[in-house]
């Protein structure tokens, strides 16, 4: 990743090596670490986390968006979820964006969690969305 200081690269590497709760989204300490780093970078930071709580990929985007690269095929199928959740920061007070929802739908992510970061680098609010079983009335996700 170009343009990052060695200390920022080390912080991203530490995030990659962290274990996240398998059942919960994150701990308070993990939210603070992610929020502080995102604010210091001035960019969204995201983690793709598997169902066992292991970080599979660290993503660094721009201030207003994050790009998820092509993922390995693995557990794909029309009805199957990928077994990954996206935990990422938003530097604005917006909740989950339309882009976040489209990523979840098209990549078949288990869930998308947006952590809002205030100007001082504190996590202030989070919002989550997950896919609903096919055949559910209305939208294919719950926010």
Predicted regions and their residues:
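Divalent-metal-activated hydrolytic enzyme cores
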Residues: 1-2, 10, 105, 109-143
């Amino acid at each position: 990743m170009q343009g990052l200081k060695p200390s920022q690269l080390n912080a991203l590497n530490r995030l990659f090596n962290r274990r996240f709760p398998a059942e919960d989204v994150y701990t308070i300490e993990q939210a603070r670490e992610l929020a502080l780093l995102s604010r210091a970078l001035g960019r969204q930071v995201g983690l793709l986390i598997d169902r066992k709580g292991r970080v599979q990929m660290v993503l660094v985007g721009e201030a207003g968006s994050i790009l998820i690269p092509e993922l390995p095929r693995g557990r794909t199928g029309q009805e199957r979820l990928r077994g990954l959740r996206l935990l990422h920061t938003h530097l604005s007070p917006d909740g989950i964006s339309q882009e976040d929802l489209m990523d979840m739908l098209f990549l078949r992510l288990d869930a998308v969690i947006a952590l809002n970061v205030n100007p001082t680098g504190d996590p202030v609010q989070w919002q989550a969305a997950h896919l609903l079983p096919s055949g559910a009335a209305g939208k294919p996700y719950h926010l």
